Amino acid sequence: MGALEGIRVVDVGLLVQGPQAGQTLRDLGAEVIKVELPGLGDMARWIPISMEDLRTPYFEACNRGKKSITIDLRVTEGANIFRKLVDTADVLVANFKPGTLEAWGLSYEELSKTNPGLIYAMGSTFGPEGKGADREGADLAGQAAGGLVSTTGSDGEPPTPVGATIADHIGSMNMTVGILAALFSRNVTGKGQRVDVSLLGGQIYAQASEYTAYLMTEKVPGRSNGGH
């Protein structure tokens, strides 16, 4: 029996950040229902190993063991079906561009009216407010905005991203931690809440020592040259 046995998660995440958070919750025992829009669905389905090998590791790695359903959230009938599904859930996981679910009438404020215990977890690139809130982006945008590409590699090299999708994965783990904290809080208060995480925020968290060193010295960190 997993620690999250009996918890239901509705996952409308895309690519890595949202789906990986849903995957971690699934690994901990939660029931996770993957919801995709009709047509292309989660775009991770369309990132193959190569043009010769069309298997999709991005999708498979982040969606193991989930249940799957297609609902068109953009139309009234689909949105109504989705609301009924969310009414049965403990957690909603998403990482659409900020404002997308709100435009479809699926904001936290709307969904929590009929499910006040809902944990509404939203991931983004730059956060829901302020500069960049209306911009889309994925892992490389998070690495670049957070400064990781400027400290990776050796002196004299151009900005170098980390080979793995590290911004996405840190963002997803931060989302998972936020969800678990919100579930604990709900046990105390009986109320759900909205959880917001961003790729940029995750990169700042992961490079706390570099940011602190800058605040202390006013010197921009250079290349790591393979070290820390």
Where does each model-flagged region fall?
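Acyl-CoA thioester-binding alpha/beta core of soluble enzymes
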Residues: 1-39, 83, 88, 95, ...
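Glycine-rich phosphate-binding loop and adjoining beta1-alpha1-beta2 segment
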Residues: 27-68
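Glycine-rich beta-alpha junction loops
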Residues: 39, 125-127, 199-204
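Short, hinge-like loop/turn segments at secondary-structure boundaries
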Residues: 49-53, 136-141, 213-214
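A structured beta-alpha segment of the ubiquitous adenosine-cofactor-binding alpha/beta core
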Residues: 54-113
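N-terminal Rossmann-like NAD(P) cofactor-binding subdomain of oxidoreductases
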Residues: 94-153
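Acidic, glycine-rich segments within the central catalytic cores of soluble metabolic enzymes
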Residues: 145-228
